[in-house]
Amino acid sequence: MFCQLAQLSGTGEFFCALAREAPQINPISSSQFKHRINFPEIFFLGRDIPSFPVDPENVTSALSIDMIAEFFSSIPSLKICGVTTLRDAERLAKLKVAALGLNFWPSSKRYCSPENASTIASHVAGDILRVGVFVNNSLPLAIELIDECLIDIVQLHGDETIEDIQFFIDQGIPVIKAVSADKLPNHELPSHDFALLIDTPAGKDYGGTGKTFDWSIAGDFVNKHPKIPTLLAGGINPANAAEALTAVKPAALDIASGAESSPGIKDFEKVQALMQTLS
């Protein structure tokens, strides 16, 4: 076990307690980071750029940093989630889709085993951002995949707490925290170190419903927190993507069922239509 998960009494929430030292990876300092890729002053939630645990000799990592900056910028981009085949991943990269999502929650109908993900992720490294989607007790796996340079961004899509998020922030790992639209905070957020993904309420299904929600809720949140990179998910498809962009003005659209022919198999006519909407 890389980290131990303990359940908070009666809350159904989890926190991560580190059970080993962090990976010994040479970090780039904040000043080196800016100079290296001419990073914008505003990154993630408007803070100074953190030190990312990236080996300066690793070309793939350097490319990923630049791609991460673009992904969380004010120009909307596209993340296609629920990728399960190398063929689809390679086609998404060729189309210049910003990011793909690999879902490591075993109960998901778009589940991608670590073995399959290793093949997919290693073949498209540096060509497309690889987002690992984790639910609750998958956190040790997230650390393992980061150590192996198989994912670029961690997406926490369960009942994780700020302690879980902070663990990855402390390692300089970009984090997206998924939040149900009916549980958005209505107050100023005290920590501005991670991005948010607003999704349709799904209970213990943790997303993947293919259903939309009242986008004015997400739009109001973005208006109140303009420096927070906010991704929008939930029932988005080529027919309503333009409306979603107008209503919310997200940093990115996160789409699974709206870009596939069956769970985990992507429909590239839909993908190309979505890309056209974003162009």
Residue ranges of predicted features:
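Serine residues within intrinsically disordered or low-complexity segments
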Residues: 9, 29-31, 51, 61-64, ...
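Residue-level detector of structural "landmarks"
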Residues: 16-22
